[in-house]
Amino acid sequence: MLTLLGLALCLTQGLAHGDDQDRTLRLYNWADYFAEDTLARFTAETGIKVIYDVMDSSEVLEAKLMTSGSGYDLIFPGDTVAERLMRAGSLQKLDPAKLAALADIEPGLQRLREHYPHSAAATVPYTWGSIGLTYNEEQIRKRLPDAPVNSLDLLFKPELAAKFADCGISMIDSPDEVLAVALNYLGREPRSAKPEDLAAASELLMKVRPYIRKFQSQPVTDLVNGNLCLSLGYSGDMTQSQRTADAAGKPVRFQYRIPREGTTVWMDNMAIPVDAKHPEYAYAFINFVMRPENMAAISNFTGYPTSSAKARPQVDPAMRDNPDIYPDEGAFQRLIPGKDIPQSAMRARMRAWTKFKTAS
């Protein structure tokens, strides 16, 4: 999800397979999904060293945990992945008495957890966000001054998408998210795998396929370098793109919009594998991370909203006061939660997605 940057030299990347020689926490998370000093400060405070293995994909995470013996003490699964892992018996049920900040979780996320009844007892929310439209304000307005930037019409109507093909359109490489957004746009069940629903979504997507330049989950570099002007993807893409452009001295402005037609919401979590060797270190890390000042630092660095209500006042106002990054209660209620669907439905959706991606 995030671009890999350098971490403190005292931190070791990659999973070590030898015997423990000291107090070591082994965690598995997306690249750059902490503040720059989070792990170093944890080690300085607790004396627990950290081995940070970078997650390639949710599918790899799931495969590692399903086979047991992963070697990790703490993992960071998405909402539906955590649900499947808990149903498979791959996660520990957490002891609330050992967690200091469960009551600090944002009320909206507390309600969102109700959609994941199996994993709620085994996870602590970490960060969250939505899927929406990140765009280069100048390039979009130059081509269409009255562009409906808060509408999926911008992407799903061929006559509009065609106007931005020359400056570059990308879609997140996620069948679950894109198909859910497309089906909801059509007024259909977002997580459906019915043939008639997938056919309707495929028809919608195929009409704009000629104008899609890339399928990728990390569009920041291409946005900043001018290879893209419109991207359907994570809400954090805008914050990261703007920060990167500002650091490079590029006079470009990016915006992010939650589509008025509705979109999906996702939540990443902290969880302890059932076979973790050092669950006590995992609890220590969760409690450290959930302190308001630490969660705010993580949010400010990653560009994603924090799960901690107490941390929100310390979040960068550019994020905190942006209603498309931190939607109000009414907008949040319209977001579509994930759903743990059967394998047969996942395969049907993947077939539709693959056909769309490979079409010319």
Q: Where on the chain are the PLM-derived regions?
A:
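Paired acidic/hydrophobic, glycine-rich loop segments that form the ligand-binding mouth/hinge
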Residues: 72-77, 212-213, 229-234
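Conserved C-terminal helix/tail region of periplasmic/extracytoplasmic solute-binding proteins
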Residues: 329-360
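A ligand-binding cleft/hinge motif common to bilobed small-molecule-binding domains
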Residues: 81-84, 230-251
